[in-house]
């Protein structure tokens, strides 16, 4: 099996919302890897980060991503930091990977002071988000086969564009 598409992007880009709506529009299953991690471990992502650390979280995430890519022909939505793993980027090769692009300002507006996002907790949220994007943006761009901006666009409009692009594939 091979997913119809894999969604990547930073926190606040709309991966969960767009993923859910895109799956509905295409009448496909959605696999949200963050939700799968929580389901399979019985813990929240912040709990895993706090008790086991980011390296262990990324190992769990790699395994969940691998399983999701093998087990569904639907839509797979990855956590924002999944792209940091060399192994995960290797797993994405040969798949339709959609990068949901967003500006730092819009990403900050959408995520706010969300303390459920471990890598944005503590310190100046703007500085943290800018650093996160500086590090991840090149990885998102290299991994993507389709790029679409979500700033100032309704989820319905983004999904409509993606449905058109995916039907052309």
Swiss-Prot record:
Where Mg(2+) is bound, by residue? 16
Family membership, please give it.
Answer: Belongs to the shikimate kinase family.
Q: Where in the cell is it found?
A: Cytoplasm
Against HAMAP family, the record matches this protein to: Shikimate_kinase (MF_00109)
Required cofactor names: Mg(2+)
- Reaction catalysed by this chain? shikimate + ATP = 3-phosphoshikimate + ADP + H(+)
Per the record, the major location class is cytoplasm
Q: List the molecular function annotations (GO) for this entry.
A: ATP binding; magnesium ion binding; shikimate kinase activity
Extract the Pfam families matched here: SKI
Q: What is this protein called?
A: Shikimate kinase
Name the gene behind this protein.
aroK
Described purpose of this protein according to its UniProt entry: Catalyzes the specific phosphorylation of the 3-hydroxyl group of shikimic acid using ATP as a cosubstrate.
Pathways per UniProt: Metabolic intermediate biosynthesis; chorismate biosynthesis; chorismate from D-erythrose 4-phosphate and phosphoenolpyruvate: step 5/7
This protein's assembly is summarised as: Monomer.
Q: Which Gene3D superfamilies match?
A: P-loop containing nucleotide triphosphate hydrolases
Q: So where does ATP get bound? A: 12-17, 117
What does the Swiss-Prot or TrEMBL cofactor note state? Binds 1 Mg(2+) ion per subunit.
Q: Name the enzyme group at the top EC level.
A: transferase
- Keywords for the protein's UniProt record, in alphabetical order: Amino-acid biosynthesis, Aromatic amino acid biosynthesis, ATP-binding, Cytoplasm, Kinase, Magnesium, Metal-binding, Nucleotide-binding, Transferase
Q: Please list the residues that bind substrate.
A: 34, 58, 80, 136
EC number from the UniProt entry? 2.7.1.71
Q: Name one GO biological process term.
A: aromatic amino acid family biosynthetic process
Q: Which GO terms describe its cellular component?
A: cytosol
Paired cysteines (S-S): none
């Amino acid at each position: 099996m091979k997913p119809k598409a894999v969604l990547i992007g930073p926190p606040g880009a709309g991966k969960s919302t767009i993923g859910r709506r895109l799956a509905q529009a295409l009448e496909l299953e959605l696999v949200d890897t963050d939700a799968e991690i929580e389901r399979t471990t019985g813990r929240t992502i912040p709990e895993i980060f706090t008790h086991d650390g980011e390296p262990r979280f990324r190992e769990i995430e790699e395994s969940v991503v691998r399983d999701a890519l093998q087990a569904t022909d639907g839509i797979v939505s990855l956590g924002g930091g999944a792209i940091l793993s060399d192994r995960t980027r290797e797993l994405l090769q040969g798949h339709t990977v959609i990068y949901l692009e967003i500006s730092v300002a819009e990403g900050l507006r959408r995520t706010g002071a969300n303390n459920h996002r471990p890598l944005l907790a503590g310190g100046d949220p703007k500085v943290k988000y800018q650093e996160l994007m500086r590090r991840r943006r090149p990885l998102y761009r290299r991994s993507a086969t389709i790029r679409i901006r979500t700033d100032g666009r309704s989820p319905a409009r983004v999904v409509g564009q993606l449905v058109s692009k995916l039907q052309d594939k």
